Amino acid sequence: MIEFIRGYVDYVCPEYIVIDHNGIGYEIFTPNPFAFQESREAAVTVYTYEYVREGVHALYGFPTREERNLFAKLLQVSGIGPKGGLAILAAGRPDELARAIEEENEAFLCKFPGVGKKTARQMILDLKGKLGALAAPAAARSAAPLSGALAEAVAALKALGYAEREIEKIIPALREEAMSTEQYVKRALALLLG
C-alpha cells in the first residue's frame, strides 16, 4: 500500500494529476485536480488510496489523510464506487459530509452527485458512528482547509483579481451548503458585489 507520494505536480487535467517523484510520473485521480494547479513550483504531498480490482489498478489522491480515510469509508457503502466517492468529495467538505451522516440528514446527502434517497440512507446505515473527528463542531470547522468545488471557486475568484482578504470574508457564507464550482462563483460574486 502506498501511504503518500511527495513530489512535484507535472500535469493537471479535469480527472487526475501527474506527480513527478524522482523521475517517475504517478497518475493520481483526485476530487479536485485544479486545487493542485497553484502547487506546480513546490513539492506537494498527496495521500493516496490504492484501488485494485479486476482489470483496474488506480491511485486516488487527497490533500489530507482524513479526506483519504473518508474516501475509503465511502467505498465500503453499497452503491458507491471510486468515481462516486470522488464526486461526493469534490462537491463538498469532508466535515460537512460526516456531520450530515451523524445527524442523519438525508436531504443534505441527496445534494451530492449520484446520491439518491436509497444511497443516502445506506451511507447513514453504514457510516454513522464510524467517522470520528471528521464531524467536528463549528469552531473547529472555521479553520478547516477548503476542498472540492469551493477551492476551485476561490482559485477562480483570485484569477478574477479579488484579494485574499476579500475572499476570506465571504467563505463562511459559501460553506453553508454544497454547490458546484459555478454556483459557488456566482454566489461569491453576488456577495462581493452586493
Swiss-Prot record:
Entry GO CC: cytoplasm; Holliday junction helicase complex; Holliday junction resolvase complex
Signal peptide (from-to): none
Molecular function (Gene Ontology), one example: four-way junction DNA binding
UniProt keyword annotations, A-Z: Cytoplasm, DNA damage, DNA recombination, DNA repair, DNA-binding
Domain of life, source organism: Bacteria
Region (Domain II): 64-142
Entries under Gene3D superfamilies matching the protein: 5' to 3' exonuclease, C-terminal subdomain, DNA helicase RuvA subunit, C-terminal domain, Nucleic acid-binding proteins
Record region (Domain I): 1-63
Compartments, as annotated in UniProt: Cytoplasm
HAMAP family: DNA_HJ_migration_RuvA (MF_00031)
Domain remark in the UniProt entry: Has three domains with a flexible linker between the domains II and III and assumes an 'L' shape. Domain III is highly mobile and contacts RuvB.
Name of this protein: Holliday junction branch migration complex subunit RuvA
Gene: ruvA
